[in-house]
Amino acid sequence: MFGLKAKSTKKVFGGIPKHIGIIMDGNGRWAKKRLKPRVFGHKAGMDALQEVTITASELGVKVLTVYAFSTENWSRPQDEVSFIMNLPVTFFDKYVPVLHENNVKIQMIGETSRLPEDTLAALNAAIDKTKRNTGLILNFALNYGGRAEITSAVRFIAQDVLDAKLNPGDITEDLIANYLMTDHLPYLYRDPDLIIRTSGELRLSNFLPWQSAYSEFYFTPVLWPDFKKAELLKAIADYNHRQRRFGKV
């Protein structure tokens, strides 16, 4: 679709990250530069997400986790929050057919109880439509917060210890990972190899703090609506110049 096949790209790069996480930042600033309301940037960001998803799929990426809405984002202006909550409805209506055609499987992490009914219905419909697909997993972090995720996992583990389902000595890193929201992902791809943040901000903002322990980070000043295929390839090229040590020398 974008003129570059995964096979030829793999000859250029030493390796493709199997799991990429993206903090999609800069929609509001992108709109402001164009003298448009912030919501205009969020709408443009949907087009970037579609292109990045298809490109990642062509490259052989297994999981793409995108930070769509954090637990802290509820403090934004109500009209903006309402617009963002409607974005999944618009995005899935417009792009699920092409994502489905490209064998993309849609999943999510996050607390669903606070999501509007229309948002949740659109998300569940997209998940159901693509559930048998075997290609890239497009994993939406929606109403997600890393600290809340870990806190919830600790509560469940503590309850299982109280119920004598677990002994304290059974608690390992692997067991904790099984209580996190990413436990539905394939075991080998639960943790991101590469985390990308757009817009020039240099922080994680509560995105996958447990899973990113050994991730490589790529920060770019490019605003999210401008982060398209060429920018993703640039990020992966940079990743391929890294030596991943996983705490070793």
Swiss-Prot record:
Origin, by domain of life? Bacteria
Q: Which residues bind substrate?
A: 26-30, 38, 42, 70-72, 74, 76, 197, 203-205
Question: What keywords is this UniProt entry annotated with?
Answer: Magnesium, Metal-binding, Transferase
Protein name according to UniProt: Isoprenyl transferase
**The keyword Nucleotide-binding belongs to this UniProt entry's keyword annotation:** no
**Record's PANTHER family?**
DEHYDRODOLICHYL DIPHOSPHATE SYNTHASE 2, DEHYDRODOLICHYL DIPHOSPHATE SYNTHASE FAMILY MEMBER
GO MF term list: ditrans,polycis-undecaprenyl-diphosphate synthase [(2E,6E)-farnesyl-diphosphate specific] activity; magnesium ion binding; manganese ion binding
Described purpose of this protein according to its UniProt entry: Catalyzes the condensation of isopentenyl diphosphate (IPP) with allylic pyrophosphates generating different type of terpenoids.
Query: What are the names of the required cofactors?
Result: Mg(2+)
List the active site. Answer: 25, 73
**Which Pfam family is an annotated match for this chain, by its short name?**
Prenyltransf
A Gene Ontology annotation in the biological process aspect, one of them, is: polyprenol biosynthetic process
Q: What is its EC number?
A: 2.5.1.-
- Quick check: keyword Phosphoprotein in the entry? no
Subunit composition and interactions: Homodimer.
- What does the cofactor section's free text say about binding? Binds 2 magnesium ions per subunit.
Q: Name one GO cellular component term.
A: cytosol
Residues annotated to bind Mg(2+): 25, 216
Q: Could you tell me which PROSITE patterns the record lists for this protein? A: UPP_SYNTHASE
Give the record's family classification: Belongs to the UPP synthase family.
What HAMAP family does the record tag this protein with?
ISPT
Record SUPFAM superfamilies: Undecaprenyl diphosphate synthase (SSF64005)
